[in-house]
């Protein structure tokens, strides 16, 4: 029996690094349409775009997507998801996958993977994914979020800083990674149960989440277990900057 889950794609027009990001054209389509098309290839029973901007609603309706208007004052994409789950009337045990609206090349297979991982780990409140890092540039890039997990695959911490900090190795040379240290980049896709989303919103943001601008730290702060698996297919570049946008355009317009 296939797993039933819903994909929600949060899409905000007011990106700090790349304004108007969801509607920027890639190969003749808005970025959010590429994300929606990839999500529709997954096993999700329903794919919904969530936004607080009327122009995004109009654009999404034009290409046939189900789109919901949400409040504009949410602290994070997860808070927005909770409102969507309430609007859709989803039960507490329903699984919702948050697919970022700036991942136009997201592999559908890893959307299925993260939903299945949450279903397989009832001790976890969240499931998410990561991939190995092999170069120091990514480790020191604050736009690449690093994650460290315990022996059971549960997250210990996330950070925009190098994590872990290889004290002795980096004191000598920051241009190469130390042997035997498994650096991993967090892939910003999450699976949740609706009941957890309700708890998440009720807690409100914590100082650690606000300092790093990483919403998953709110969950760790409150003792929630986050299961982290290596993605079975590494996603191509997401779009955080104008340079990322040009790389994705070259890939999709080739």
Swiss-Prot record:
Record-linked InterPro entries: Cytidylyl_trans, KdsB, Nucleotide-diphossugar_trans
Organism, scientific name: Pseudomonas putida (strain W619)
Pfam families from the UniProt entry: CTP_transf_3
The keyword Metal-binding belongs to this UniProt entry's keyword annotation: no
GO cellular component term, pick one: cytosol
Family: Belongs to the KdsB family.
UniProt xrefs under NCBIfam families: kdsB, PRK05450.1-3, PRK05450.1-5, PRK13368.1
The protein, known as: 3-deoxy-manno-octulosonate cytidylyltransferase
Ranges in a coiled coil: none
GO BP, sorted A to Z: CMP-keto-3-deoxy-D-manno-octulosonic acid biosynthetic process; lipopolysaccharide biosynthetic process
